[in-house]
Amino acid sequence: MNGGYAICAGLEQVIDYICNLKFEDDDIQYLNSLNKFSDKFLDYLKTFKFTGDIWAIPEGTVIFPNEPLLTVRAPIIEAQIIETMVLLLLNHQSLIATKSTRIVSAAKGSPVMEFGARRAHSIDAAVLGARAAVIGGCVGTSCTSTAQKFGTIASGTMAHSFVQSFDSEYDAFKAYAEVYPDDCTLLIDTYDTINSGVVNAIKVFNDVLLPKGYRPKAVRLDSGDLAYLSKKVRKILDENGFEDCKICVSNSLDENLITSLLEQGAKIDSFGVGENLITAKSDPVFGGVYKLSAIEKNGEIIPKIKISENVAKIINPGFKKVYRFYSKETEKALADVITLHDEQIPDNNYSIFDPENPWRKKALLNYYCKPLQEQILKNGELVYSLPNLESISKHCKDELNSLWDEVKRINNPHKYYVDLSQKLWDLKNDMLHKA
């Protein structure tokens, strides 16, 4: 994405897929009908089970370009069979989680709710996209299936069709308030926000809620000039004694529009974000790739490299690890370094350099570092404890707090260092020159 960082998401679904992958009789029959596969291969699929090892970066972790999010060490046929689903699941949810963090950041602490199910590209895109949005910081989702399945908050308000189905706007608001007196949020822009919507909302607050001892939760705006209308509505609510009534807005919001609204002094307490979040409309493709970087023969790991005229598509060879360095003084992330799997990181004084411009060097001092990947599967068996969605979301928040604000800027972010170890850089260049 066009930002300074990304968020890793989708690992839980990758694990579920790989651990439960098998080929049923009807799958074998279909593949046989294509007349493309040998009986030996089809017999192999009948008893297929993934038997390899997998290491991965946990969900909610901040990631950067060229870093190995997931490493598979397995018989090559097993590694290739899982490729498409691994990419699909990681790319999709990492995309939405990243977009979510940008939108949540723009909201400057005001709650953001995911409202995008009706604009998602499929059922799975709605359900898993909402999950990813919560990882990125959304406080809830209007997709009740996601809330039920993953234990997050189901949030939403009335629809315009609900208001239209009554003889009057007042009648609609009154009926809603009588059913939800303790959680009353009224949609006030169906007809005329200022001359009708907020007026009828206040009448219902006085006629229904106050006599029962309740206070209104919020009003919602879903159209029009949100900056102007929110200021007018705030003034009217305050003048009528409802200073505690929140204002929620929606309507094709994204991080840029939210930033603009707040810069204009809009009186907004929360945001409902739909299509621009659930589709990551501004940058709808996450470019994760799945490449062979080494093979193992007789216990020896032999590095491999893919070469391209496009420098960005030249992979880093070998069986790798990635480490993140933190300042002991500030606890902020300093740089990431990709190494070969058998390298050791010294306790202090580590020199990093720009892989594209190796004369640009920097000495890291007074740091601590940690490997980003954890082992997930060993010999095909799960050895990793899956965190719940709340824990993943908290981890994401902690990860973002470890970055300098300059790296998190929505526009023109500072470039975070992702460097290669000297050993890996030498290996890569040697292989390029010999190719």
Residue ranges and their predicted role:
Residues 1-182, 210, 215, 291-435:
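Ordered alpha/beta subdomains of enzyme catalytic regions
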Residues 161-333:
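Glycine-rich phosphate/ribose-binding loops and adjacent secondary-structure elements
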